[in-house]
From Swiss-Prot:
GO terms for cellular component: outer membrane-bounded periplasmic space. Residues 275-287 are annotated as: Insert. Pathway: Glycan metabolism; osmoregulated periplasmic glucan (OPG) biosynthesis. Belongs to the OpgD/OpgG family. This is Glucans biosynthesis protein D 1.
Amino acid sequence: MHRRDLLKQLAAGFLALAPGLTPSTASAVSPASAATEPFDEAWLRRRARALAAGPYRKRNTALPPPLAALGWDAYQSIGARADHALWAGQSLPFDARFFHLGLFFKSPVRMHEVAGGQSRVIAYDPAMFDYGKSGLDHAALPADLGFAGFRLTTRADPTRDVAAFLGASYFRAVGGQWQYGMSARGLAIDTGLRRAEEFPDFTEFWLVRPAPEADTLRVYALLDAPSVAGAYRFDIRPGDTLVMDVQATLFVRKPIERLGIAPLTSMFLYGENDRTDRAGDRQSAARRWRASDWRPEIHDSDGLAIWRGSGEWIWRPLANPPALRSQRFADDGPRGFGLLQRDRNPDHYQDDGVFYEKRPSVWVEPAHGWGEGAVELVELSAADETFDNIVAFWRPAVAPQAGQELAFGYRLSWGAQPPVAPPLARVVATRTGIGGIVGQPRRHFSWRFVIDFAGGELGQPGRAAVEPVIRVSRGRVEIVSARPLANIDGVRAMFDLVPDAGNAPIELQLTLQSGDRPLSETWAYQWTPPADRAV
């Protein structure tokens, strides 16, 4: 499937992530079958290894006719019954509610409960759902229908989700602001290449019954795709920052050109850095949208943060490019990376319906050394906010070959702030616009970059002089300055870039320094010169 089609479907499907229905007075039913079999992580790895040793079998996507006939409103009216959730009425700290098949979610996902080292299939039961206004005759559905995915709630607040797994290998979670936003997924394959991307699927889940006072829920998953099979373990701990510890073991079926570990997916339509028509192709749909939308900014994330193995911190503001583009940040033993929503000011969004200022940031922390590779950022052109057009992931330096076994562990932190932050000054805003000196004739085209830094030593009295150190891959830099910015107790750095005749993206970096000593994280950017360079 093409990426744009799938992500449109997932964005629409995740709109269904609303609070669960109020529990009824009916007693909870057991959703599990009687037959059990032994289960542990080693068994799951053996299962994935055996799966990868055979040919890939394409999943069934033919919905039963009653489900295939459902439209958007009808499908959206089907909700999980809280009183028939897994572990409902058992005084346990978590329960799980299942998504019904239908609409965009056509391939059944098998669910299992694990207790005492034994697993049992969770059978589809129409009693688990309220069919609302769908008009669906559930008696006409097959008994082994299966599910589309699941969502997790807690005993502390059973009306609100803390995490959900739905569609391909996608999942989402919330932190203390109880707001869904960007997604993560199990694996990315050939993302950002100029051909159809491969989307692995979580085909089965095993939910481990929690102890009565547990603060963490363990979930296992089996992943399958034409190129790879995998065994996954998720340890999910809700809180102001929800933490997921992920362990993945992959078994490669065939060579993979671009493998993405710990992939994150988000949306960036426009921000203060990316509003101006001349920032790219002024005829693009995205530019027309931002010229007419009343909201100042629309994005789930506004930047990629990287903590390199060397200790350097990088901040790369996101953009909505005129065409597909990617940027790689080579590293050896990365300490972490994430897609963040740094801007938390509601006045900058003016949207009291979706609350972009509350969208969670997600930080990836490798559990063990990942060696050589690169953090890769892929940006696609988006015409509206329903399309997740941003992807970031870790790409190992050596492409996997058929027969290889790979293991990766990492922690995902979902919340308003990442668990770590640079001790230096941070970028708080990036703006761009036409260059030159106001009031003087422009003799050539140039583009201005304005970067605001705050924190670190910048607000301290008697600090040393600040020098902006700028590096560009092409073109010429002129009109450089760095001056105090009192309203943020920081520094504003500015420069103009005069591009050469080429149209390929230009990479830029800027760091504030005092002599050889860095005072700020490294601001990194990628800019595509416009075709129209009239002055």
